[in-house]
Amino acid sequence: MQVIGITGGIGCGKSAVLNMLPDLCKCMVIEADKVAHEVMKKGQIAYEAIVKEFSTDILGKEKEIDRKILGNIVFSNEEKLAVLNSIVHPMVKTRIKESIEEKKKEGLLDFIFIEAALLLEDHYEEICNEIWYIYAPFDSRKQRLIKARGLSEEKILSIIKEQRSEEQFRRDCDKVVDNGGSIEDTRKEIVKLLENIEHQ
């Protein structure tokens, strides 16, 4: 079983790639964001550490962490965001490692795909056989983000500027998937990558 990391900047179409993968191979797709939601739930591994750090003011109904309140605190304060990430990210990675081990024992899958915005920063190369960079040119990304999220060009530029550059992604990833054309072109490219791995 191969573990493949999926990463790329905002608007590169990572979700579209993730959605097509289960039709192309026997796989499981793990999204780090969804795992983060899980570990932050009441009774889960990150809950107490987050409440201790940010106080019970962040709790909403049923004493669950209110992600909106927490978001308002951390996204205007880099220091607090770094603290939150230092709590959540290692726990997410641990939970993902556990899932991988579980699936390896079951032996039913050929691939596990892990998608995380900070895949490289959080050193997922330690648990991945390969990391794929989902690439799309700026104009494609811009159109997607205007359409899907209603963002202004100025806002899009400021988000992209904060993220890893295309050169850095290309340098640090093993494979590049060009997602700037049609969905069918992307699909063909992924099929080819999967076949290459299976024939190794």
PLM regions: where:
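Walker A/P-loop
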Residues: 15
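ATP-dependent NMP and nucleoside kinases share a basic, alpha-helical "lid"
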Residues: 97-106, 111-148
